[in-house]
Structures are given as C-alpha cells and as structure tokens.
Amino acid sequence: MRRLGLSLHHDTSPSFAALACNQRPPPNGTVHACSKSRPPQLEPGKVGKKPIKKTMRIARIPTSIPPHLRLPLDLSAVSPMGSASEHDVREHLLDVDGVGEEGAAAAAGPKIRVRGLTRRSEARGEEILRGVDLDVPRGVVVGVIGPSGSGKSTLLRALNRLWEPAPGAVLLDGVDICGIDVLALRRKVGMLFQLPAMFDGTVADNVRYGPQLQGKKLTDAEVQSLLSLADLDPALCSKPASELSVGQAQRVALARTLANDPEVLLLDEPTSALDPISTQNIEEAIVRLKKTRGLTTVMVSHSVKQIQRIADLVCLLVAGEVVEVLPPSELSEAKHPMARRFLELS
C-alpha cells in the first residue's frame, strides 16, 4: 500500500495513519509480516531513553483527506477498522473475543500473555529482549521499570505489533495477536507516546479523527466526555491544537486514543516531558480509566515513585529480561540488586 509521508521534527517520517492513533511505526517506516511460527506450549511460568527536551512537537497535518488518498493509505498502524465491512468487523471481533467454552477460558486468564519474546537489534546485532515471559491481568495497571536500554519501549511496541513479536508469542484474550487483523488489534490496544503529534485543527478535530476514519462522527457531547475522562476542560473543544501546552497535548492525545474505545492502553513514558501538575493530571486520568472503564494498562516509566502511586503490579526489566514482577508495596523486598538500586535512587 502507498504511504503518505509527513514532515515531523524527527529524523524519520512516520506514516500518516500511525499518527491518527498516536502510534509511531518502526524506524524504517515498515511493519513486517508476522512470523508464522506458533506460540510455545503455555505452562505456568513466572508472571512475569535518554532525557528529552520539554518542548512540544506538533505535526501540522490537514484534517481533511482528499478522496483519492483515503483508501490507498496504509492503515496498518491505525486502531480504527477503516473501510472493513460490517461482516468482516464482526468476524474479527468474534475471533478476538472467542465464544463458548474457549471464550470463557480466555476471560478467566490474563488479558495479555507474553511467552518467549525475543528481539535483536538490527543495527547492533545484540538482543534487546531475551525470552520475555509476562502475564498482564485484566483491569490492572502494570508499571514497567528498568534502566535505559533494557527493552521497555520495545516490549510495548510488540504488544500491538508495531514491532512483530517473533520469535515468541503475545496472546490477547488467549489469541495469538499474529492471527488477529492488525486494524482490529490496534483498535483494541491503543498506544500513547511521550510526545504525540497533534493534527492541524481544533482539539475536537483531533479527538474525532480516529472514529472519522471509520465513518463515524462523534457528537460534541461525546468529545467533551472523552476530554473529561482525560482530565481536560470540555471547553477546550474549539481551541486550536497548535496552542496547547505540552501537558494539554498529551491529554488530548489520550482522549484521541480513548475515542477508539480500546481494551488495553500502552503508555510509553507519557509524563516524562510534563510538569508536576500535568503529571498528576495524567496519573489521575489513568486511575480513573481503570475504575470507570476497566482498562488494562501497561505503562513504562523511569519514576519508581510514580509507579508506586498508580500501578497494581511492577515489572522490572533488566538487559532485556523480566527479573521481578511484584506489587509496588513489595518492591523493598525484591531480590534483584537492580530493584534495590532503583529504590535507593528514587
């Protein structure tokens, strides 16, 4: 499929469709086909960046798409279903949700199950992830901490196929995500980055964009409700996105992600560029979404204190391996020396 290049304040040019749901494609701008290998037999196992400038980066993207560009766009990085028929959508949802005994069994298990996930750096040839095993329970916030370069962001990208989870397997509701249509998957698994791009236009234009790709227009009341969920004043609807502060832009991006009604939220250091008040606003929004929507959230952070405030489980990733998974209250009892080091420095 053709891609529409966009000029951002980055060295790469992410696809137009990826930006529609706050997702950035891999550095080479492509999404590789999933491995055909099957996931390993699941057995009970362990449940288991450098500082950035505090400046806002806004992509001036027109909110109206010429008709001749609407369908050919590579929508593989967009959460909405795009132009899929109602029949296709229903089939995808049935495939993901499961039915009968299998569906009930999936509902009883973890929301996300990772087994044997390994990834090697193409540039350096070294392993970024080394056989990661991790279970993410339903309706909880899992905080992922670890030193820079330990594979935290790579793990997040594998959970919705921005990086292909191969070798290894990632299961969503018991289903291998490589067997799920990528558009259906990213509609269910939303992702928010440190500095999301804003579309040119108003705040409401940004929030409406994902559903608009599905042919649905959110009402003013729906947009305002989403802004409230993201801890924003609904009166911001008509404000130009170019005039938003960094903290406001981050929360508008959160509302834009929520407009796709995801079941899982992936957050890659969403508060690293924010002031303390904006950070608190984002944290409160995450907790509220867990309580009101039952969202399963996986959040990468360098702040142990932040994870202790909002997470139900902490996953410590060191050199590409999960070395500890435990409740925040038990971090002081962690056996791995890196966990103790993190606590000493927090």
UniProtKB/Swiss-Prot annotation:
Residues 23-48 are annotated as: Disordered. It holds the Pfam family ABC_tran. Expressed in roots. Induction: By Al in roots. Positively regulated by ART1. Belongs to the ABC transporter superfamily. ABCI family. GO terms for molecular function: ATP binding; ATP hydrolysis activity; phosphate transmembrane transporter activity; UDP-glucose transmembrane transporter activity. This is Protein STAR1. The gene is STAR1. InterPro entries: AAA+_ATPase (IPR003593), ABC_transporter-like_ATP-bd (IPR003439), ABC_transporter-like_CS (IPR017871), P-loop_NTPase (IPR027417), PstB-like (IPR005670). Its main location: membrane. Associates with STAR2 to form a functional transmembrane ABC transporter required for detoxification of aluminum (Al) in roots. Can specifically transport UDP-glucose.
